[in-house]
Amino acid sequence: HLAKMLSGNGHDITVIDSDPKLLADVASLADVLTVEGDSTTFAVLRKASVRKCDLFIAVNHVENDNVVAAVLAKQLGAKKSIARIDNNEYLEPNNKEIFINMGIDYLFYPEKVAAQEVINLLGHTSTTEYVDFSSGRLSLVVFRLDPTSSLIGRELSGFKDDAAQLSYRTVAIARGGQTIIARQDEIFMEGDMVYVIARQDAVKEVMEFSGHSNVEINNMMILGGSRIGIRIATELQDEVNIKLIDYNAEKAYRLAELLDKTLIINEDGRHIEAMLEEGLANMDAFIAVTGRSETNILAAMLAKRMGVKKVIAEIENLDYINLAESIGIDTIINKKLVTASNIFRFTMSTDVQAIKCLTGSDAEVLEFIVKPNSPATKHPIKDMRLPQDVICLLYTS
């Protein structure tokens, strides 16, 4: 996914992997060069001409390989190197400094970022996606138009008229697997996923106007003792009653020692009767993070059917995302998109402060600083000649 996105933005990409089939699949989807071999060897890195690269990204599933490859690439001449890690200990300030001294510019832990996204969403249950921009002054919120929504059949401009006092702007609409950059004459339809940027003090009113309101989370069930599940439970177990379910008995015992305020249950989340016996219907939130997309989707569907107010599922197969959204799962977490959002900004100008790849959409939201005397400062925003698929949302000064 990352290679496809970067190549689509005009970058020259070389992909290294020891699996020839994987390389063939990547080459069929994106305009990239491929090099077969072990990325932790000098010979393969030299063959890939890392000495000429502006950015080396090590996102293998093996943490040690990523660290070694990123260090070697930097020593061979790469201008910047990034390594995906699985150990939160590496991110502690003193330890992080060691990796910087070794030549790694940025360490990225996708599970930590994904867990934090879930925690943020549990504080804003009315939205299916929530991201802060401009140091918290602006927020991206996403909501689905349910059959009873008063917005269905109305033009986007009508939404603005009724909520004129709100400081917001609609970014895009995801509909039927397609992304529509919002224009004032666009008509809302049932099932639309609507993406809105709003000022922080207007988020609550925007969501209420759209027919969604926050619910308090007191009881929560997590399916899967994965790194994401553990981090969520660790952060929230002092505030929320949590049940964490995992099918592996040995792991369940380890989790019970680690999470002293979380009720750990050794059970298979695919068994409907077992889930109901554990009180699924009484939960305010259900989070499926087993690491298996199919299991997460089925469990999330059951939770929705039982009336759980907030249902979140980790879905790593990108082909399943639109399906999952169409059947009513509130929020999708995808580590590929989380990784892409965090790494993509390293390919941009230093003036880009943040970037978010939208789940269920092929659009991105960028926050950037306008330089003095740049072309953007010489015209009103309405007179800027932006590409057809680009929209200026809000600005702060």
PLM feature spans:
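Short amphipathic
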Residues: 138-147, 356, 365-372
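Short beta-strand/loop turn elements enriched in aromatics
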Residues: 149-167, 372-391
